[in-house]
Amino acid sequence: MADNKTDKADQIARLVQVAHLYYDENLSQQEIADKLEVSRSLIAQYLQQARDRGIVRIEVINPMNSCENIALEIQERANLERVFIVPGMHKFQDLTMRAIAGAASKYLEQNVSDSDILGMAWGRTITRLVQLLAPSVPRDIDVVPLMGERGYTGTYSQINQIVLQTAQSFNGRPYFLLTPMFVSSVQLKQDLMNDPEVRPAVERWDKLTTAVIGIGAVPPSPGSIAYVGAKLMRMMQERGAVGDICGRHFDDDGNLIENEMNDRMISISLDQIRKIKRVIAVASGVEKTRAVLAAMKTQLFSVLFIDEMLAESMLNKMRKVEK
């Protein structure tokens, strides 16, 4: 019985995936077939099944749809330059994350120019964003990491790999930060940041023109706890932490929470981020509602990419506070 449910869920997930690639990513049926290593006729069948099951609905709608209305309201309430909301796919987190990454990658391609210095954070959505980059022309840019490597070995935490892939996509120059994010002492941090192999990346933090950051929630996902430690995470929660950006934790009012790890952290400061001309933030999942609402109060970013469920949850909270 369980196997039948699993098979059905897998089948629906495949239909959603194919429909997303065809209707949202504008890939042809042949391109999707090549990507998934199946026949074009099977893709056509999947698309028909998606319509028959109600996964895809073709209808004429008002161009100013609900997502656009929500985006504009959040944008105005938070005084942001742009808010982009990826609609639908509530039950398929991976596809939702990919859709956010796809939208953000296109925005980045269109808004990076020659001579820019681009800073990259790490995270699952940012990793997918980098994988989807396909700028039409090369750019003469520098790409630098915004923090050191995490001890956790998940691929989404490998900051220098993210920097390398981004630089290769734009045909730019990567600058690596071959240090851990957390070190054992303040003196070691200072020594490492002054090291000739590290200094070129760190010195560019004050010259960044664009940055891409993720917004972490507190408590974070189980895998993310590994880079901080359960003890420190409990302490941060007790002090009122609700989220983090580049490892720097903040409270509901967007204020930095001081802790002994800050002095031993090799990561760009929030003040440095605040001075960057264009900062693009990405977040997905309704569980990040509180974190993103607090992050907007930090005034660290001007462009935000989120999913529909998260956006609706955020706006409901914002309206309740107003009442």
Where are these regions (language model features)?
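Conserved phosphate- and dinucleotide-binding cores of soluble alpha/beta proteins
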Residues: 2-19, 24-31, 37, 42, ...
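Short alpha-helical
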Residues: 65, 124, 128, 287-290
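Short glycine-rich phosphate-binding loop at a beta-alpha junction
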Residues: 117-123
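Generic hydrophobic alpha-helical segments
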Residues: 18, 100-108, 129, 201, ...
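Structural beta-sheet core signal
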Residues: 120, 143-145, 176, 281
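HTH-adjacent hinge/linker in prokaryotic transcriptional regulators
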Residues: 3, 8-9, 45-117, 131-140, ...
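Short Gly/Thr/Asp-enriched flexible loops that form oxyanion-binding sites at enzyme active sites
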Residues: 125-138, 223-232
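Conserved beta-strand termini and adjacent loop/short-helix elements that scaffold enzyme active sites
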Residues: 86-88, 146, 177-179
